[in-house]
């Protein structure tokens, strides 16, 4: 008990010192700066690009600034599992390319650092472990599809972000943001608050200005929820719009890779870089046909709410009332008190069939992923379970268990029970959100936080979260806009217009 008290008060003192230092840095000339004209605090992709072009900043210097910020704050936040040993080399290459080429013709992400959730594979010196020691030292065959596109855009891979271990699919008892490798991620606004997950580190890193932009993954809520809890923008694309090849999977039917950034425009620029056909992910073939010519940045318009029909579909708190007024003021037609049939069944997860299907899909998908690894200490879900039992203390099995793993391992493929579950989800989607949107001619549905993530998840629908405020204790919350498959253009218009009309986001203060 004495040791615990000493640790607690020592940690608190460190937090207070770091917090005060960061607050002072944000509000004064003592900010972390390269020069008197550039700061990484809240810097957007456009800010960085302009600084590059004006010779006020190099990519190498930018990477150094982010690495410095990580070294100072990551011992408290546990947002980054590891940084890339080659990040500075990549940045130097980008700087040389910028000197040799017409900068106006370089991709907008050229030389910009990106952090990846630790379930997204990279064929380099970085590990890809889903936060588990079971995969430490494994070697992937190739970059994930989205990473390949990032490299082609000239982005610098800064490192791997922490996450809820195995994307929160080892045990539902594991706290959001915890993994054996990454430890417990902290919410930068209120350190004792839930950072959410499973893309916790991606959201924490971005909101704490440890990186410019990041990528997360979502099966059900894992982008939208941490984005909401950490006052950042998260885009969960329609399933298939971004490749899942090379990503530690849960369900190819529901998994989606998307941006987590501080602004809608940054998220859209990152989305533009990662969408497209990948022969290693069959779902991208059909989805790529819906990518608009010229990309998604053309939908970044401040008039994006004008004439949009938006539906409020769940009982909402007074926190949303103010924003409903804003939406209407900006020209949207807001229809209140709408109902999605069987919403309680969908949100519940078990009765909808989602959990039944995910368990079987996870075992099949993970086994396939592990077998494709060039080198790995584990080759199947059964191997991972055995590893956790052997190294139970390291993986905190006694504390958190692995009941989801065990239940998934007991499945035997897509049997009648699983097929019935899949059919039920299709019917719930068809008779639920699809019918609601079509009958009311809606452009999007609206909710606080990620309350409708399961509605979007089971149908492969897209969603965007935008910062919407802070509660009385300083904990952030967001507003989410969801729509039918491939309705990203409308959702981006709505989200960007809302963001620009409110400009609610503010940097964290690290309240202990």
Swiss-Prot record:
Record carries keyword Chloroplast: no
InterPro entries, per database record: Amidase_dom (IPR023631), AS_sf (IPR036928)
Enzyme class, spelled out: hydrolase
Family annotation (Pfam families): Amidase
Tissue-level expression: Expressed in vasculature of roots, cotyledons, leaves and sepals.
Cystine bridges: none
Keywords: Hydrolase
Superkingdom of source: Eukaryota
Record's protein name: Probable amidase At4g34880
Organism: Arabidopsis thaliana
